């Protein structure tokens, strides 16, 4: 599994809801840490899909690391 953080600057609630629904469909766990950061937990292929998906919002996925 991989853990990562998504930076969600200047997002509306609809943007977060769209990312959340994508995660739910692809078996990715996502947690809102605060107004800017979201923590995600996913298998490597799904994390890659998420990275491609959030790029369309001009968002970034950073600090990806292995989780035991």
Regions found by a protein language model. Name each.
Residues 1-11, 38:
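Short glycine-/aliphatic-rich beta-strand segments at the starts of folded cytosolic domains
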Residues 10, 15-18:
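Amphipathic, interaction-prone secondary-structure segments
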Residues 17-54:
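Acidic, low-complexity, intrinsically disordered interaction modules
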Residues 29-33, 56-68:
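Conserved short beta-strand edge segments in small beta-sheet-based binding/regulatory domains
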């Amino acid at each position: 599994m991989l853990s990562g953080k998504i930076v969600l600057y200047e997002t509306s609630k609809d943007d977060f809801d769209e990312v959340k629904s994508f995660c739910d469909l692809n078996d990715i766990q996502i947690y809102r840490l605060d107004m800017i950061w979201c923590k995600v937990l996913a298998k490597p292929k799904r994390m890659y899909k998420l990275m491609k998906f959030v790029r369309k919002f001009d968002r970034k996925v950073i600090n990806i690391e292995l989780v035991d």
